[in-house]
Amino acid sequence: MRVVVTGGTGFIGSHTVAALVRHGHEVRVLARRPEMVARVLAPLGVRAEAAAGDVTDPDSVAAAFEGYDAVIHTAAQIGVSGGRGRCDDVNVGGTKTVLTQAVRLHLDPIVYTSTISIYLPSQLPVVTPESVLAEPLSPYAASKLEAELLVREFQAEGHPVTSIAVGGVYGPDSPHLDSSFAGVLGALRSMMLVPPGGTTVVDVRDTAELLARAATPGRGPRRYLAGGRYVTWSEWVQLLGMAAGTEMARQDVTADEMIALGREFDDQRKQGIEVDIPLTEEAAIIMTRCPPTDDSATLSEFDLDYRTTAETFGDTVE
């Protein structure tokens, strides 16, 4: 198949391009900076055509889709603070543009990369694809929720949109040290605050392989979870320390203490005070209210098994 990937110079997107190429697909990357495509893909040992454009621009999106069969939409604006601005433009407007143009040009499938944050924070013992969506705690979360509702509208209309909600993504060869890596770097450089609860860890290579396997036409609208392996925060620290070959400094805290500290850091940032620890009140709430995800249907349908967290962390810090 001929597949367009948005966000192909990002972490998930670049690995998805590599997985698609390994599966024998012809890949085009829609990028605002097309000169970055070859540079980002080089460490992964693959090449792809680059098309200049922005997911918020209908004309460049339509031009990139011409002559192609399917699209995997991984482009997103990540952030948990500040005004909605670019988050709305990319996460909502960009998603609407991609879906609209893909439907108009009869692409099949249209694969959308969602996030389990749409379900968080949650008091449920386990999150499933049918779990209730959470009330957003930040402009970023609000934009992802709005995008998710938009995707579900397209699915309800019968369009061949496959959505896959992924968890905390880690692994090797990240073009940009952001997102999950902020927590890793902060924990390794200073100290890890360890609250009750846990988190999901999914390897970027497993995520990419799943997205590549989802690029199958004729399946109609589908929704999947790919949160990954669940670990407690205590296990997270232990596994990361083993991967780094060091005993990590840690301090156990209660959920209330963690949330209060996140709120204090938010207040300091508003006052222009630089805070080295990548913790916000929203992040603290989610850290203490993130249940496991039931990915069994996803793994069974796509005949996939997740790498161990030890392997993922080992390759992350390498």
Where are the regions that the model predicts?
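A conserved pocket-lining segment of Rossmann-fold NAD(P)-dependent short-chain dehydrogenase/reductase
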Residues: 183-202, 206, 210-213
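Conserved catalytic-site region of short-chain dehydrogenase/reductase
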Residues: 80, 116-125, 169-175
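NAD(P)H-binding glycine-rich loop region in Rossmannoid oxidoreductase-like domains
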Residues: 44, 48-93, 101
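Mid/C-terminal beta-alpha module of Rossmann-like enzyme folds, strongest
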Residues: 210-277, 295, 300, 307-317
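Conserved Rossmann-fold NAD(P)-dependent oxidoreductase catalytic core, especially the SDR/UDP-sugar
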Residues: 93-140
